[in-house]
């Protein structure tokens, strides 16, 4: 396993700026609003051929009555428990605070390497003003400017020398990447916490509580998964604040990174236009899809309730007839145990390969039973089909008229492939191509 490095500290001391500096891309949101990174945010980093997992956290306030800040504090404690090494960040401009002293006292009791860092030291003036921090009595303090990359290289040289890493045990394991998407406050974070078995993501009744797309590795029956709890995707008109805009883009990027997308719907509100747009993002990205109807326990139901809601989903998501539907309650855990099993089945289909012989047997039979319509008065001829890719399964069909295939006939061929080979939960790509002489 890769070693884990956690970045902790009070709100707005520059943790996310340091995180982004080390990751090399803008992964955590950076804004002047305290508490902008509310959850733990993970990234895999490889620095000078030493791989590790870097964890950014929300601000750590030892004493607070604010419920959200209390939750962020608990997330920071979880991160410190998981970590092999801790980077504790303080703010040179804000000076040494009682909260900093409280955290240092707590870190002294942790039997792990801790690096004490004063951030926002942009020059000699700030270096001189940082003298108060040496009263903490720790062995060594590093002064850096994460924003201007001052002192970061020297810091990381020492960090890399201190982290435990056994290259012999490290392997590039296959991992299933799961994105959890949906409108704000449909219960995504509660669902993630239920799947993981502990409070990994801040769950709060306030819509938009999860701002960053947060990655978590976990295993079920020794099988590895990466779970991405995306920020809620709002309608464009509601994406007003700069931070909210970042979150929507982050959620869409999370779909791009995923293998399987859990599209979370709110049973209390039914299917909305925004749900359709979100599902459309996943479909257009070519990802495996599962509908998860959450808050099912809150509805008054009869024997036809599931059938009626299923019909509503199929009517509104006609482009996803292959996506399984699960009715769950993240709050109570009802049926959530079925989700990972369904993910495994969809992933199997998402990676499925069919031999050229099997494929052409089904394809030839389909064409014989239903000939393609004429194209500009020409008869459409098909030569053969072959699978060229997985994730999603993609096929090339060679024909004399690649531009003249009607979309309804394309859908017919894909339906015949599904009837023969399954492909439940995954989109298919079908490409019609003219036959070159070398293909003859």
UniProtKB/Swiss-Prot annotation:
Highest taxon of the lineage: Bacteria
Cited CDD domains: EngA1, EngA2
Residues noted as binding GTP 2 in the record, renumbered to the chain: 182-189, 229-233, 294-297
GO function term, MF aspect, one: ribosome binding
Location of the KH-like domain: 352-436
TM spans (from-to): none
Listed GO biological process terms: ribosome biogenesis
InterPro entries according to UniProt: G_ENGA (IPR031166), GTP-bd (IPR006073), GTPase_Der (IPR016484), KH_dom-like (IPR032859), KH_dom-like_a/b (IPR015946), P-loop_NTPase (IPR027417), Small_GTP-bd (IPR005225)
Record-annotated EngA-type G domain positions: 3-167, 176-351
Record-given protein name: GTPase Der
Organism: Geobacter sp. (strain M21)
């Amino acid at each position: 396993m890769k070693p884990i490095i956690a970045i902790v500290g009070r709100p707005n001391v520059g943790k996310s700026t340091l995180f982004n500096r080390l990751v090399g891309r803008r992964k955590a949101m950076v804004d002047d609003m305290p508490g902008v990174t509310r959850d733990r945010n993970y990234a895999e980093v490889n620095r000078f051929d030493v791989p590790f997992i870097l964890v950014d956290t929300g601000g750590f306030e030892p004493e607070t009555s604010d419920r959200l800040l209390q939750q962020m504090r608990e997330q920071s404690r979880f991160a410190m428990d998981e970590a092999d090494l801790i980077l504790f960040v303080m703010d040179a401009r804000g000076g040494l605070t009682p909260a900093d002293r409280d955290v240092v006292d707590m870190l002294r009791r942790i039997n792990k390497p801790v690096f004490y860092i004063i951030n926002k030291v942009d020059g000699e003036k700030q270096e001189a003003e940082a003298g108060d921090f040496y009263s903490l009595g720790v062995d060594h303090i590093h002064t850096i400017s994460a924003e201007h990359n001052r002192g970061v290289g020297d810091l990381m040289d020492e960090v890399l020398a201190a982290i435990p890493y056994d290259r012999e045990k490290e392997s590039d394991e296959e991992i299933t990447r799961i994105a959890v998407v949906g409108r704000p406050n449909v219960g995504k974070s509660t669902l993630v916490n239920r799947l993981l078995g502990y409070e990994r993501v801040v769950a709060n009744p306030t819509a938009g509580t999860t701002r960053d797309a947060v990655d978590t590795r976990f295993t079920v029956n020794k099988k590895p998964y990466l779970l991405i709890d995306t920020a809620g995707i709002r309608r464009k008109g509601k994406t007003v604040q700069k931070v909210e805009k970042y979150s929507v883009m982050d959620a869409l990027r999370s779909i791009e990174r995923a293998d399987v997308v859990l599209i979370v719907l709110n049973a209390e509100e039914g299917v909305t236009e925004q749900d359709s747009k979100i599902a459309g993002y996943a479909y257009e990205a070519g990802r495996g899809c599962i509908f998860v109807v959450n808050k099912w326990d809150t509805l008054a139901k009869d024997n036809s309730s599931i059938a009626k809601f299923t019909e509503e989903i199929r009517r509104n998501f006609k482009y996803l007839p292959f996506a399984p539907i699960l009715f769950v309650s993240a709050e109570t855990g009802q049926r959530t145990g079925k989700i990972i099993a369904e993910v495994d089945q969809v992933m199997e289909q998402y990676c499925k390969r069919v031999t050229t012989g099997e494929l052409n047997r089904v394809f030839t039979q389909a064409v014989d039973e239903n000939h393609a319509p004429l194209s500009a008065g020409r008869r459409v001829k098909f030569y053969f089909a072959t699978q060229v890719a997985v994730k999603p399964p993609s096929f090339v069909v060679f024909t004399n008229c690649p531009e003249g295939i009607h979309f309804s006939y394309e859908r017919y061929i894909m339906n015949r492939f599904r009837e023969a080979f399954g492909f439940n939960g995954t989109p298919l790509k079908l490409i019609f191509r003219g036959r070159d002489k070398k293909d003859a």
